[in-house]
């Protein structure tokens, strides 16, 4: 079991959440697919709840907030910060557009949302009582986060300026991809890449991969539970994966990492 109880290093993907048009339906879907249980919804925070795996927090769900009914349903990825004001200033200087003003979320921490210069939206989270994921890289928990954009070079420059990312190229000319490591990190924390050749006019964005024990079985659970599969299970260098969508069309990846990953 991979658990984490402290604040995550700055720049590390530390949280993901989703606004759902029907919270109960979405909770049921992810319970069936990933085995999640849930904390009580908190009315004072818009009905927000945490998804749990054996009591550890792995993601957040909330009803669609008032005034955001037309917003796309996507999994939002939050990058850790130990000083949200300082990192917000760096993001602005590096060309980001602020989408949601920074705010305190009760005793839990502070957050804001931005779009990087390539148009990919991301959040920042400065932890207080809520430090982010307390379980990762286990079935039901987040295994990987990355950002895919038509201009990965610009994205790399931006995140290096804001968070000090260092990169290791593992892609090629047809599909550039680099692993990023945060300052002081001893292993990659995520990735930045360009779209696959057959991706068409894919929108830039951060994505999340949830770990499962058996990708093929999980894909069948997605279908049975009312979701869809846009990319059938297949092997790749680092394991086996499939691309899925949930009840609101929100896209996510299911993956089983290779034992050597």
Stretch-by-stretch model annotation:
Residues 1-8, 12-21, 50-51, 64-90, 94-143, 168-185, 193-197, ...:
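Vicinal oxygen chelate
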Residues 3, 7-10, 14-56, 93, ...:
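Core segments of cupin and vicinal oxygen chelate
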Residues 18, 35, 121, 207, ...:
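Extracellular/lumenal glycan-associated surfaces
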Residues 26, 36-38, 57-59, 68-69, ...:
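Short loop/beta submotifs within extracellular cysteine-rich repeat domains
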Residues 43-136:
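Active-site-adjacent scaffolding segments
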